[in-house]
Amino acid sequence: DFIGSSTNVIMVASTTLMLF
């Protein structure tokens, strides 16, 4: 679960960076 959460956070961060 921890690894899954970390991956999810990284994906969200990457998406946010792409938007900006």
UniProtKB/Swiss-Prot annotation:
GO cellular component: chloroplast thylakoid membrane; photosystem I
Taxonomy, superkingdom: Eukaryota
GO biological process, one term: photosynthesis
UniProt-listed InterPro entries: PSI_PsaG/PsaK_dom (IPR023618)
Membrane-protein topology: Multi-pass membrane protein
Localization annotation: Plastid, Chloroplast thylakoid membrane
Family statement drawn from the similarity comment of this UniProt entry: Belongs to the PsaG/PsaK family.
Stated name of the protein: Photosystem I reaction center subunit psaK, chloroplastic
Upper lineage: Eukaryota, Viridiplantae, Streptophyta, Embryophyta, Tracheophyta
